[in-house]
């Protein structure tokens, strides 16, 4: 029988059908991986790393801290069914205890979307954990430290001190702040202060000030899923603390890769402002 050549218009449909047919096998493989026990380090810590001899990174979840009023409160399936991001972990806009100026700024940012991340600036909180290049969490019990590496974009990393130290009293405000951590059962709890007000803690620009006290809770739900929750306690921008979160998925056989933000950024209008109509160097990175 001669080979059948499909018309170009049908080829994308054929590829889609083939991909859908492959989903059950992939889902079955994912179920097998989820059945693997949560790995631990020699000192008893839950491991967020790839098992010895294997590769893998944590893939980003939904990096919004707040969802619109009209969005359905359902669990969205990510990565062809390999994990879910429960939207009920995220508050609706009306439930966030904004101060008036912070609400106004948040709404302004939804229209203009001038995110510092698009200009190669560092991020914090949920946004630092949710990047398109994969996230590495490296645990060094010998040093009593945990590192969270963001190899793409701004090439930044965080150090979480696990040795019981207190926050310094004379911190200079920075994008990442100063982080100390401890374990509550199998949940890593990270306490961070010392932020400046220029970094965004999510992709939609929930405002923060230098009064921000961020508490993050990271739990490996099973082999394939990582629960991330953060509580924002910032009396400069909100009238009460509030919590949001996401679920991240393990991507096996993958590694973080280098992306040079300044050299690789093809959206020059985000770097200097003005779009295709010209360069507006007065456009603020953070209003």
What are these regions (language model features)?
Residues 17, 27-287:
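PEST-like low-complexity, intrinsically disordered acidic/proline/serine-rich tracts
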Residues 11-24:
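Bacterial N-terminal signal peptides
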């Amino acid at each position: 029988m001669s080979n059948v050549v499909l018309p170009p218009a049908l080829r994308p449909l054929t590829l889609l059908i083939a991909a859908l047919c492959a989903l059950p096998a992939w889902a079955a493989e994912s179920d097998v991986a989820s059945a693997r026990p949560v790995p631990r380090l020699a000192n008893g810590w839950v491991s967020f790393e790839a098992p010895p001899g294997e590769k893998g990174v944590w893939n980003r979840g939904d990096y919004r801290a707040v969802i619109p009023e009209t969005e359905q409160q359902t669990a969205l399936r990510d990565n062809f069914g390999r994990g879910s991001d429960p939207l009920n972990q995220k508050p609706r806009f009306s439930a966030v205890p904004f101060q008036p100026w912070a609400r106004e700024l948040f709404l302004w940012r939804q229209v203009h979307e001038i995110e510092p991340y698009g200009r190669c600036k560092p991020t914090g909180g949920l946004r630092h954990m949710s990047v398109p290049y994969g996230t590495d969490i490296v645990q060094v019990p010998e040093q009593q430290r945990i590192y969270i590496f963001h190899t793409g974009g701004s090439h930044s990393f965080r150090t979480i001190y696990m040795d019981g130290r207190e926050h310094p009293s004379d911190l200079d405000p920075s994008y990442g702040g100063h982080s100390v951590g401890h374990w509550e059962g199998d949940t890593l709890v990270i306490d961070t202060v010392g932020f400046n007000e220029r970094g965004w803690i999510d992709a939609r620009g929930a405002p923060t000030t230098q009064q921000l006290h961020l508490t993050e809770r990271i739990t490996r739900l099973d082999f394939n899923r990582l629960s991330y929750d953060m509580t924002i306690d910032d009396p400069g921008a909100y009238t009460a603390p509030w919590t949001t979160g996401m679920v991240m998925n393990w991507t096996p056989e993958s590694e973080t890769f280098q992306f040079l933000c300044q050299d690789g950024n093809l959206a020059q209008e985000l770097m200097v402002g003005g779009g295709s109509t010209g360069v507006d160097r007065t456009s603020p990175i953070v209003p």
